[in-house]
Amino acid sequence: MIKAVLFDLDGTLTDTIQDISDAMNHALRLHDLPGWTVAEYCYLVGDGAKTLAKRAVRDRQDLALSVQKAYQAYYETHNLVTSKPYDGIPEMLDELQKRGYKLAVFSNKPDADTKNVVAHYFPQVKWDVVRGQVGGVPVKPDPMGALAVADVLGVAPDEVLYLGDTATDMNCARNAGMHPVGVLWGFRKEDELRDSGAEVIIAHPREIFTAQKL
């Protein structure tokens, strides 16, 4: 029986890609490097700031760490400019909360940024856990962080529904023994979600209630 719902943040709860793109392109400009389009960033993001920077600098890996630091410094103060919840997300969260499910966010975004975005856009939700990337915990798809969240929630992994928009999320859910649900309103396509093991794929937040019989 499902007792908790765990959400990825970027591309799942919130459309953050423009703010992420602007922040990384700002960092790249500071280093005289070319930027990327928003559409391209949809395939660069998802695996944490360190990996994003390595991908963004192309063959200038010697600048990756400096670009990462510049990106994070800028994004910390510019992560609420254009970002917004996806249509139907607030209503879905309200209904899940009414039905008594434990709710959590687990992101590869730095922990402080994760907490800031969630607190700003979802103040009405009584989250049980909100956690981003912290030192000593491998990024998704390693299951360590997801399992730690389940432990705090006091539920078994197979009692957790995990919603995400990328293969990283689906693989993390599978690695942790949770139930992966792919969402189509985020950054990636249906084929990627199916190929990475999504048990269910939904096109609108309200579908979660019928797809998983919550």
Write out the residue ranges for each language-model feature.
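Generic enzyme active-site microenvironment
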Residues: L6-D8, F106, L163
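Hydrophobic, well-ordered secondary-structure segments
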Residues: A27, A70-V81, A104, V134-P138, ...
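Short, surface-exposed connector motifs at secondary-structure boundaries
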Residues: E95-K102, A156-P157, R174
